[in-house]
């Protein structure tokens, strides 16, 4: 149960952004799309705050399109891998493995080949708060899957964290540190062979 909550929290998405009164540049959505589409790979440390307040950390790897890996450090030690447009989650403590289609997760947006913040995705909130851009989106055809709030530094534009508001109304926050963009990643990181 803990594994599923962590997985859902790590993959699903976020709270509605408030308003700061700051005027946003008219092209900000286009700038965010360009920024996200310019990311071929991402490697970072993460800290996660689960809905129950538990804290965990580890490493995240993204290789667009379609591949993602979350490695949780002890005591969690969970592993989440997205490849072939499916997400495989393995909890070694319970020895349980769960598989879901990427498109059933709000974080699937970050794995798309061509990221668009319209059409399949609807923007629910857009605000600048304390020099950060908060962009909240949900899947247009599946609003019940949850929301994803992406938080960017503004100067320069950079992804700092995201929050997932899942279908049960629970929020999980993931903060990124030591982010490296467009660096080579070993393809073995995204193998699910040992997870089943």
Q: What is the predicted function of each stretch?
A:
Residues 7-17:
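Bacterial N-terminal signal peptides
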Residues 19-29:
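Cleaved targeting-peptide boundary
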Residues 36, 106-118:
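Short, solvent-exposed helix-to-loop capping segments enriched in aromatics
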Residues 118-196:
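Gly/Pro-enriched, hydrophobic low-complexity segments
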């Amino acid at each position: 149960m803990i594994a599923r909550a962590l997985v859902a929290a790590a993959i699903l998405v976020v709270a509605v952004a408030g308003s700061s009164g700051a005027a946003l540049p008219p092209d900000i959505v286009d700038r965010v799309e360009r920024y996200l589409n310019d990311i071929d790979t991402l490697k970072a440390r993460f800290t996660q705050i689960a809905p129950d307040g538990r804290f965990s950390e580890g490493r995240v790897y993204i290789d667009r399109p379609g591949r993602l890996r979350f490695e949780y450090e002890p005591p969690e030690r969970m592993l989440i891998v997205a490849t072939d447009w499916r997400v495989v989650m393995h909890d070694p403590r319970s020895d349980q493995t769960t598989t879901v289609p990427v498109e059933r997760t709000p974080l699937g947006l970050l794995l798309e080949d061509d990221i668009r913040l319209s059409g399949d995705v609807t923007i629910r909130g857009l605000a600048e708060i304390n020099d950060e851009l908060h962009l909240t989106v949900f899947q247009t055809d599946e609003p019940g899957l949850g929301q994803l709030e992406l938080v960017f530094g503004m100067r320069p534009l950079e992804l700092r964290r995201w929050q997932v508001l899942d279908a049960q109304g629970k929020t999980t926050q993931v903060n990124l540190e030591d982010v490296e963009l467009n660096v080579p990643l070993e393809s073995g990181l995204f193998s699910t062979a040992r997870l089943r």
